[in-house]
């Protein structure tokens, strides 16, 4: 099964997450199929908090990929930001 989930990057006390498509059997920071965007929970100033390719997420969900709970919330937020812009 394929999932869209977060993989951690960044430094200690300064997390940064990539939003990726991966097989559920892969490790958190292991092999991925495609990188769809990123999430920066500690963004400051003009830095974007979420950058996500909504069209590619829709493509993967249409092909049977499942979103994790956190990615689902980020997807909704990115979609509403795109509609507002």
From Swiss-Prot:
This protein's UniProt keywords: Ribonucleoprotein, Ribosomal protein
GO CC annotations, alphabetized: cytoplasm; small ribosomal subunit
Pfam families linked: Ribosomal_S16
Disulfide bonds: none
PROSITE patterns from the UniProt entry: RIBOSOMAL_S16 (PS00732)
MF terms in GO: structural constituent of ribosome
GO BP: translation
Family according to the record: Belongs to the bacterial ribosomal protein bS16 family.
HAMAP family registered for this protein in UniProt: Ribosomal_bS16
Protein name: Small ribosomal subunit protein bS16
Lineage of source species: Bacteria, Pseudomonadati, Pseudomonadota, Gammaproteobacteria, Lysobacterales
Gene name per UniProt: rpsP
């Amino acid at each position: 099964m394929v999932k869209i989930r977060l993989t951690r990057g960044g430094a200690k006390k300064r997390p940064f997450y990539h939003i990726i498509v991966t097989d559920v059997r892969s490790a958190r920071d292991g092999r991925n199929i495609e990188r769809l965007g990123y999430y920066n929970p500690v963004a400051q100033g003009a830095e974007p908090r979420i950058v996500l390719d909504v069209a590619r997420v829709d493509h993967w969900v249409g092909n049977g990929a499942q979103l994790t709970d956190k990615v689902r919330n980020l997807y909704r937020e990115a979609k509403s930001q795109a509609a507002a812009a």
